[in-house]
């Protein structure tokens, strides 16, 4: 993956410079459904790379995919994002195939910078620019997505809360979808963080609800490098029964342009 190559190339340079210049700090958005309302450092590329096996879902019996999110904050209140699954291997109706999945372009804007228990508030928008045709997870693959995000720290715990309004399409029919997610995280053993999450999405074409409970552990190897692993268990009959996650978030330590 792109992030792994960049990490290997830059690691020696970063080590040599670490005594002189502090590393910028990554702001992971994976592997939870919720996205932080806060943005990545201005002028730095952040890569969120992972592998996701999943089992027993309405559209597949098994699915294995690589996933990548690239983020770039260009101002203190504006971030651009690319989200993609380069390849997905899946089994459905007894047949196994490989296919690229979807690509999304999006932007996130901060409405209010909070501090401590006062939440940071943001909104974001995503549009699917490529449909690879791979079977989707229980919450579908929206053509358009609008999110409202809030993040804050309260008594040693951090939370990320998202509300989703999306558009699902099965030609020629278009239907609205609603969702909510809440992630609560707490650090332990200095470099580790435990995250628990509950999420819900309506399923307008199935006339059901996808509900899941996700747990993840992350390890901060450096300020700009965070590893993660976890799992998600579907709680409704039309949810993906099991998903696992393993990956990392890497913030490229070189600013793309000089600070103002």
Each predicted region: which residue ranges?
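Transmembrane beta-barrel domains of Gram-negative outer membranes and organellar outer membranes
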Residues: 16-260
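C-terminal segment of classical bacterial N-terminal signal peptides
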Residues: 7-15
């Amino acid at each position: 993956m792109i992030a792994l190559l960049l990490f290997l190339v830059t690691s020696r340079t970063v080590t040599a410079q670490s005594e002189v210049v502090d590393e910028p700090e990554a702001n992971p958005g994976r592997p939870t459904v919720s996205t932080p309302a806060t943005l990545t450092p201005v002028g730095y590329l952040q890569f969120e790379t992972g592998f996701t096996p999943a089992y027993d879902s309405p559209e597949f019996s098994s699915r294995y995919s690589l996933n990548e999110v690239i983020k770039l904050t260009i101002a203190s209140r504006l971030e651009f994002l690319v989200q993609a699954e380069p390849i997905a291997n899946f089994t459905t109706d007894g047949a196994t195939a490989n296919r690229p999945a979807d690509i999304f372009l999006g932007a996130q804007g901060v409405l209010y910078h909070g501090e401590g228990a006062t939440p940071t508030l943001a909104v974001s928008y995503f549009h699917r620019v490529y449909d690879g045709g791979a079977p989707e997870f229980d919450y579908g693959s929206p053509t358009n997505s609008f999110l409202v995000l809030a993040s804050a720290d309260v008594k040693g715990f951090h939370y990320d809360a998202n509300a989703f309004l999306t558009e699902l399409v099965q030609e020629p029919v278009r239907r609205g979808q609603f969702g909510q997610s809440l992630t609560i995280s707490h650090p332990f053993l200095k470099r580790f963080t435990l995250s628990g999450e509950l999420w819900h999405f309506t399923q307008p074409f199935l006339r059901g609800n996808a509900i899941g409970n996700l747990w993840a552990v992350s390890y901060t190897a450096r300020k700009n490098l965070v590893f993660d692993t976890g799992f998600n268990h579907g709680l409704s009959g039309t949810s993906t029964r099991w998903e696992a996650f393993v990956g990392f978030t890497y913030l490229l330590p070189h600013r793309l342009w000089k600070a103002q």
